[in-house]
């Protein structure tokens, strides 16, 4: 999936990107770009989501990694963007709490779930929680609220403590996704990342879940194809 989450770099026409077979596009507003979002971009985003080449709305969400000062504008922008949600099109969420605090992470997931339920009451909405690092209670909360919630895992699993490991183990096998998040994250071996390195993510996930990497890889691919209706 090719993700365009900076309004300034959205493609003019996603259908003319000439992507390789099997690739598709997501468009959204990363929370760090929330300040740039306005009426002009809202209208553009609405039109882009009508393109048959666009398969998802995202990334959208809340990112407190640079402090809480921008939380208000990020929250307002998220509420606004969620007005464009469509049940047949997955929402890709990006959540990051301030600091390395597992309790703050789980609290952020709970807070945004409440906001999402208010703006997107259709519980048939498909959801992809990108780079998920919540606990098992968070998995249950989102799954109960939106049964179509999928949980994505990247090379970040190599640094998981007990709490997010419990969350990873609690994810149903048919709701687990694998992510490279390239080029932003290094892969689990510390190399420059690429979607072709996804097997290394599968190995990291498999170690936590006590499964074979090949089974994890097969499940992740099948789940991604089903979620994005690309099979």
Language model: regions and residue ranges:
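Mid-domain alpha/beta scaffold segments of enzyme catalytic cores
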Residues: 1-231
